[in-house]
Amino acid sequence: MTRRNVVAASAACLFAILLSAAACAAAIDPAASSIGFTLKTRWGRTLVGDFPKYDGEIALLPDGRHQVRLQLSARDVEIEGNQTFTRLTRGEGFFDAGRFPRVDYVSDPYPAELTRAGGRLGGLLTIRGVQRREVFVIRPAVCERPGVECDVVASGSVDRNHYGVDRWGFALSSRVVFTLRVRTVAGEGA
């Protein structure tokens, strides 16, 4: 085999690998999924937040494990029924969406069985440019193909102070509980 043929064959193999990797990611369906959070005030009121705009996928890695990759729009975050809290949440004292327009999460690689059986899923959460390891708890699935036939449901509690979201301590709890209900577009499970 000539050097030219080896280079051409290598390029063809690399192209095939890249194509198969792209085909192995299941996009998160924004019409059938929801990503939000709750936050308690010091007076006992629960504020319910929603990320109506986000991008995400569940990638199938070469070793057969999966990985969640999410980008949530902090610019579009909403607090249900309260425009004042919506404005404050997007502002400098909370997400500071003008400077940090996204909240990112990349999970650790995990076996597909985790979404069926439930369990803990670690990963890197980035808020306001601060990246920290956090753990979310996946609930056991109520169907055979989670993400396709039923939601994958996960939740996790983070301390907002760890991300520089430390204003309004007199009025807001430091704990923020994120909740995700996820379905995929591609028809591939999570």
Residue locations for each model-derived region?
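N-terminal export leaders
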Residues: 3-7
